[in-house]
Amino acid sequence: MEQMDAHQIISFIQNSKKATPVKVYLKGDLEKIDFPSDVKTFITGNAGTVFGEWAVVEPLLEANKANIEDYVIENDRRNSAIPLLDMKNINARIEPGAVIRDQVTIGDNAVIMMGASINIGSVIGDGTMIDMNVVLGGRATVGKNCHIGAGSVLAGVVEPPSAQPVIVEDNVVVGANVVVLEGVRIGEGAVVAAGAIVTKDVAPGTVVAGIPARELKKLDAKTASKTEIMQELRQL
């Protein structure tokens, strides 16, 4: 999938059909209800479940009050512009509770942990781990064999469209609770210490820390051993 630029994302959101899907559990004399074709029904006898757009389902419920004994509605979004990514055939490990929007690219053997939020246009390279509760903003790009630590935020850029997204090159380790501001590029093999706020580019093969993040040293063997990427965690 080719990465979308900001104008393409804006157009995608603007022109998308906004959706308010609902799931309704019904009980009553349901055989008397004429369900339209755009409502999916799973009904046996006097009970069942239906799926559809609220704009269609709401008047259906109102018009058939006499035939419905009881119902419960489940709804988790309103006028949503971007569907969630269809993950069924992605060659990666994606744990429950990750929220991944459509138009996201996920490489082979990547790992997405619980609670991660990945916005439209993001790219995750082969073998990269996105840890728990990480936020990847719109168009954020992470290279291959990286680790983005729990609770970290890579700032997204959709508006203004002229701004540049965060880019993390290959073999980078980002510690927990790091914030990387928009437009920052983290060079290949760099290490960002936990809790850092990265406001400017990070040179390849360096170690940075602090608020704002500053270079501490070049990557040495000791630091490399402490930040080793374990391929065993990425096997499917």
UniProtKB/Swiss-Prot annotation:
Pfam family, one: Hexapep
Name of the gene: dapH
Name of this chain's protein: 2,3,4,5-tetrahydropyridine-2,6-dicarboxylate N-acetyltransferase
Metabolic or biological pathway, per its Swiss-Prot or TrEMBL entry: Amino-acid biosynthesis; L-lysine biosynthesis via DAP pathway; LL-2,6-diaminopimelate from (S)-tetrahydrodipicolinate (acetylase route): step 1/3
HAMAP family xref list: DapH
NCBIfam families linked to this entry: DapD_Ac (TIGR03532)
InterPro entries given in the database record: DapH, DapH_N, Hexapep, Hexapep_transf_CS, Trans_hexapeptide_repeat, Trimer_LpxA-like_sf
Chain's role: Catalyzes the transfer of an acetyl group from acetyl-CoA to tetrahydrodipicolinate.
